[in-house]
């Protein structure tokens, strides 16, 4: 008995479906992961950053604490053009690692008996959504723009739902001149430009009243020059929590800001600025996503307004306020 004609085409149909499988988006694969990392030297909880590098490729940066020491590893990921599968491979502790991504998780083997098993998480900064205290000057809330001016004169892409705006052409300046001490809160969201490198990834900037820039950039597992990464005092000082990338150790630019979250996720800066008496320099302390990145850094004091830089990237801002300390 001959099989029905329809059945004869099933293998071809299956091959066609596999050949045109839709790969997961970069947005769904990139991000923070947590889980376990086990190899010949031992087993421990792992924190992992999967960084989108463009054209379906990724960089996996893993770290764990074993026997009181931080151990790091780095492997590469790629997307199969036919199957759409995202796989990772490389050396971890001298052993070959093979892993694959599926539905928000990455799992695989390390050597003969080791394993990597991690799941994607979302880390929310502790001060995200922090309400302005009594007496604070609200610069951006998505509704009232009396205390902030767009240099172009036009506000663009206002999201009334979350109160965010896209940084306007030419940037934006606060209206009131700040003379002395203050606390400032800024929330920002960097766009994803996976094929870009260094300053091309989600670039903007938060200029304090004295015109010292705290850089805004997609620095999630991404390196750049001194002070040029997210949270850096531009071309002057890196954040105090820089993390090395194993393959770049020994090179000039080999670290990234450990406090940085993935692009497309809301992040927060909280800044304390204090003027000192007797002609001494002002002291600035900053937290990035709840992590202290600058501790009483000395800066030249100058009264002025805040500026938020337009650097050709659709970076978004929301919930910006400043509280002057009398």
Residue ranges and their predicted role:
Residues 1-6:
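Positively charged n-region of N-terminal signal peptides that target proteins for export
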Residues 7-16:
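Bacterial N-terminal signal peptides
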Residues 22, 28, 32, 43-47, ...:
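Carbohydrate-interacting regions of secretory-pathway proteins
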């Amino acid at each position: 008995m001959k099989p029905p004609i329809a059945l004869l085409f099933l293998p071809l149909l299956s091959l066609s479906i596999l050949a045109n499988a839709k790969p997961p988006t970069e947005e769904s694969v990139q991000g923070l992961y947590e889980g376990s990392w086990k190899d010949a030297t031992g087993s421990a909880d792992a924190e992992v950053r999967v960084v989108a590098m463009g054209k379906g490729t990724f960089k996996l940066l893993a770290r764990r604490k074993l026997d009181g020491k931080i151990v790091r590893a780095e492997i590469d990921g790629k997307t199969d053009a036919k199957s759409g599968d995202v796989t990772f491979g490389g050396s971890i502790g001298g052993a070959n690692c093979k892993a694959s991504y599926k539905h928000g998780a990455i799992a695989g083997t390390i050597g003969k008996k080791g394993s990597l098993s991690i799941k994607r998480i979302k880390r929310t900064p502790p001060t995200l959504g922090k309400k302005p205290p009594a007496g604070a000057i609200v610069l951006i809330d998505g509704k009232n723009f009396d205390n902030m001016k767009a240099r172009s004169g036009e506000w663009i892409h206002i999201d009334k739902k979350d109160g965010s705006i896209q940084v306007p052409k030419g940037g934006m300046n606060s209206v009131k001149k700040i003379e002395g001490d203050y606390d400032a809160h800024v929330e920002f969201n960097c766009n994803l430009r996976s094929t870009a490198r260094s300053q091309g990834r989600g670039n903007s900037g938060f200029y304090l009243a004295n015109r010292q820039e705290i850089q805004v950039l997609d620095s999630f597992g991404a390196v750049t020059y001194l002070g040029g990464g997210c949270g850096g005092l531009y071309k002057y000082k890196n954040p105090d929590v820089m993390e090395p990338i194993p393959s770049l150790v020994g090179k000039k630019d080999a670290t990234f800001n450990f406090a940085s979250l993935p692009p497309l996720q809301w992040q927060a800066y909280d800044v304390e600025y204090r003027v000192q008496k007797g002609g001494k320099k002002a002291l600035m302390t900053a937290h990035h996503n709840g992590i202290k990145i600058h501790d009483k850094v000395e800066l030249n004091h100058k009264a002025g307004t805040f500026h938020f830089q337009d650097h050709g990237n659709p970076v978004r801002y929301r919930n910006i306020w400043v509280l002057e300390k009398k």
